[in-house]
């Protein structure tokens, strides 16, 4: 096990021309390979902003994010896009599946974007959908799937490129207790298979307690989560 990602003194400030709003203030964190880290916080605490920065979807006001000791903000736009597609997976509370495509096509999309041959991309996508228990739903569009099934498709899509790190924003937030438990078990199984690391943003303290480690984000700053 080694350190996969580290951020130092990460800050984010928005300026609307009249006043400045400090969203994140000197955030420091690290995550190791195969580790599940929870970040707990209320709405508006900056959790989603932090994930956007860790995923190179936004630029910080100050601070650094190192992924395997490489500064992701020193990458060109093309390098950042390649980094996101090949090294990261994203899971959101809203699944963001493309409604006009089947489950199989949605999951294959990251590999198709990476210019993999369609036949190979579909093969990998089918394997991943089988792992999440959706072998019988390959040709179904999102509108034909249940909420839990759509979230499993989103997780399969996040993992189809075998990313080293998955960033998950409230992955069980819209699900009932039974379906949410199934998603948690699935994350564990896939972590064990692929050694993927997870950073999970949640307001669900019970979920956070089941992960390897948890931090609380309050007023833009991180601190250890106490039981």
Curated annotation (Swiss-Prot):
User: Could you tell me the superkingdom of the organism this chain comes from?
Assistant: Bacteria
What subcellular compartments does it reside in? Cell inner membrane
- Every ABC transporter domain range: 5-226
Binding of ATP, residues: 41-48
Q: Which UniProt keywords apply?
A: ATP-binding, Cell inner membrane, Cell membrane, Membrane, Nucleotide-binding, Translocase, Transport
Principal cellular location given in the protein's record:
membrane
Q: Name one GO molecular function term.
A: ATP binding
Instruction: Give the enzyme's EC designation.
Output: 7.6.2.-
Q: How is this protein annotated for GO cellular component?
A: plasma membrane
The answer on whether this UniProt entry bears the keyword Oxidoreductase reads: no
Per the record, the GO terms for biological process are: lipoprotein localization to outer membrane; protein localization to outer membrane
Q: How does it sit in the membrane?
A: Peripheral membrane protein
Q: What class of enzyme is it?
A: translocase
Family matches, as SUPFAM superfamilies = P-loop containing nucleoside triphosphate hydrolases (SSF52540)
User: What interactions and quaternary structure are annotated?
Assistant: The complex is composed of two ATP-binding proteins (LolD) and two transmembrane proteins (LolC and LolE).
**Purpose:** Part of the ABC transporter complex LolCDE involved in the translocation of mature outer membrane-directed lipoproteins, from the inner membrane to the periplasmic chaperone, LolA. Responsible for the formation of the LolA-lipoprotein complex in an ATP-dependent manner.
Please state which protein family the record places this protein in: Belongs to the ABC transporter superfamily. Lipoprotein translocase (TC 3.A.1.125) family.
Q: What is this protein called?
A: Lipoprotein-releasing system ATP-binding protein LolD
Upper classification of the organism = Bacteria, Pseudomonadati, Pseudomonadota, Gammaproteobacteria, Alteromonadales
């Amino acid at each position: 096990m080694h350190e996969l990602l580290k951020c130092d003194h990460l800050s984010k400030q928005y300026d609307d021309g009249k006043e400045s709003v400090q969203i994140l203030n000197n955030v420091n964190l690290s995550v190791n390979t195969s580790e599940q880290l929870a970040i707990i916080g209320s709405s508006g605490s900056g959790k989603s902003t932090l994930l956007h920065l860790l995923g190179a979807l936004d630029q910080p006001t100050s601070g650094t994010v190192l992924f395997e000791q490489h500064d992701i903000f020193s990458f060109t736009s093309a390098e950042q896009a390649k980094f996101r597609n090949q090294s990261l997976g994203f899971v959101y509370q809203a699944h963001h599946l493309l409604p006009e495509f089947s489950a199989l096509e949605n999951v294959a999309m990251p590999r198709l974007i990476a210019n993999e041959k369609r036949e190979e991309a579909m093969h990998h996508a089918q394997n991943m959908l089988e792992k999440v228990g959706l072998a019988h739903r390959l040709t179904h569009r999102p509108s034909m799937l249940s909420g839990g099934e759509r979230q499993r498709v989103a997780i399969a899509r996040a993992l189809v490129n075998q990313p080293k790190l998955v960033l998950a924003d409230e992955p069980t937030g819209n699900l009932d207790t039974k379906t949410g438990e199934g998603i948690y078990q699935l994350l564990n199984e896939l972590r064990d298979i692929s050694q993927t690391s997870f950073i999970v943003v949640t307001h669900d303290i019970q979920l956070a307690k089941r992960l390897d480690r948890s931090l609380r984000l309050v007023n833009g700053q991180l601190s250890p989560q106490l039981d």
